[in-house]
């Protein structure tokens, strides 16, 4: 060992050692955004819908469909984590990258850089105290997808009835089940069951994306988790039945990249949702007037 190092006072060595350790830890850590920088991004791109307080009550909130997410409860629908869990940062970034088909939530894949997306995610997490005290649960395990076949679709149709999916989504999957007009989210907003025949699924058309919804549910909505009641085989059959309802799903493929949305499909979904929401709002208004 060098006599120079031995002669160096410990008070001089320790700060340098701590600095090196911190640098090493930072290099090996997951990318983390800067909330202060994220506030700037949020105020430019998000505040008009999600509001200054993250309560989903921005100036444009009444014109969006569905209503913008209220971030304050830390309740998010599109996750890879189990029911009731916080989402991962990757889950939140995925929504920013892909947007949500059939809704007013557009993609920011080219508008925001990866660093900017991480920054705004860090800022969004400041709206809910849950992120300071909880961690996301381990992500849902998805078994390998079996082949898409006529038999799997037939079995999936039976699973669809077994778990009363038609109660909300309707016998033909058109979102017009007996309970469709009475559903509310956790904030008391009318919520429309998804029309599975529209063409594309909000979370993505691939098998694993749909499978994950059955197992994780959609936090904050009437869509429950079936993790404790559905078997993996049943879940995959149900996935294939849901895919069979779509007029654009490539029936000869299993998973893979979905085809592009049909022209006007997104606008049709929005018009349909707005129409049903407007009808519900009118009924509520008439009730208030007595």
Report each predicted region and the residues it spans.
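N-terminal secretory signal peptides that target proteins for export/translocation
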Residues: 1-11
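Extracytoplasmic electron-transfer domains, predominantly the class I c-type cytochrome c fold
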Residues: 62-109, 117-124, 182-245, 287
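Bacterial N-terminal signal peptides
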Residues: 11-24
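Electrostatic cytochrome c docking/interface patches
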Residues: 25-41, 131-161, 200, 249-255, ...
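Serine/proline-rich low-complexity intrinsically disordered segments, especially terminal tails, linkers
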Residues: 4-5, 21, 71, 277-281, ...
